[in-house]
Amino acid sequence: MPVLVELRGVSKHYRRADTGETVVAVEDVSLDVHQGEVLGVIGYSGAGKSTLVRLVNALELPSSGTVTVAGRELTAIPERDRRLARRNIGMIFQQFNLFRSRTIAGNVAYPLKVAGVPKAERNRRVAELLDFVGLLERAHAYPEQLSGGQKQRVGIARALAASPDLLLADEATSALDPDTTSEVLALLRRVNRELGVTIIVITHEMDAVRQIADRVAVMEQGRVVEVGDVYDVFSAPKTGAAQRFVRTALHDRPSPETLRRLRDRHPGRLVTVQITDEAGLQNRIDAAFRAAGVTAELVYGGVGEIRERRIGSLTYELSAPAGGSGAAVASGSSGAAGGSDASGAIDAAIAALRADGVTTDEEAAA
């Protein structure tokens, strides 16, 4: 897939006016955004996400490194040429940034008017875009007459007015309720699929990434610490930052508080098994427990979908009768005391799952 945006060794440093201290906003970022994809860029406040957006659309220039969009190195051309290049980059914002004194149609038409598009062509394009975002009947309304979700739809229509190849969405759903967020993300996905627009979604919400993105870049302290296919990052996050974000979106692992409550009710060993879209995975899990003579009670977990692929985890309470059986006996643990036999059977079940490639973690005792 062709690369639309290319960042190489990009850093952005600021000097504080009051102290003279150097602040590192973005540090040594190299990243490709492929044409036609939706890339989620996620990080906590202060991670450098919004600065990265301003570097991509050349509202700011990097302290070092290069930014190339659609084959043009924005860091190496005059400001006049950068302004022209920005017409190929649409932008939507958290707070909508609509003109209160203009109608909905007037807001969408504004960038076309600035670009000198003839009135008849402007009107045609505005009607087309308002129909696409489902607001054609509100063309003559004013922003204060719209809900937050409707305002963001206007923002999306305005960002698409000049038919850009690239759309930047900077925390575009952060001010919206969950239902409206899902609607706006679904609209952005339509923009990507039906119009072929490449989208970079800047967010601190991993659930938004799960719903819309093809790939995700995780930022921490100005650096991109992990990049990958969304499913791969969710199923096997490699960095602590990615692991924390995944937990907030899946809610499939017990928190320390939940774990304490589970232990009060379930005295057996608590083991969490990762669920993926592998064929027959659940049958293999059940078979491993049966072969070891282990009783498995499901006590926590959740399984969802990303791009129609299953993902999640299930936490079981594992117990075995004193004396052991199955794989535990075969491994020679039957001569131990009753408690050791039961523990050996559970160890055998866990070992069998891991040998079969199933990610299995025992929840540590409090």
Regions found by a protein language model. Give the residues of each.
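A short, proline-enriched helix->beta-strand linker immediately N-terminal to the Walker B motif
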Residues: 161-165
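Conserved ABC ATPase signature
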Residues: 142-146, 150
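ABC ATPase NBD coupling module
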Residues: 19-20, 74-90, 114-120, 233-237
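ABC ATPase "signature
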Residues: 227-228, 236
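Helix-to-loop junction immediately C-terminal to a conserved catalytic motif
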Residues: 57
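A short, surface-exposed alpha-helical micro-motif characterized by mixed small hydrophobic
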Residues: 209-211
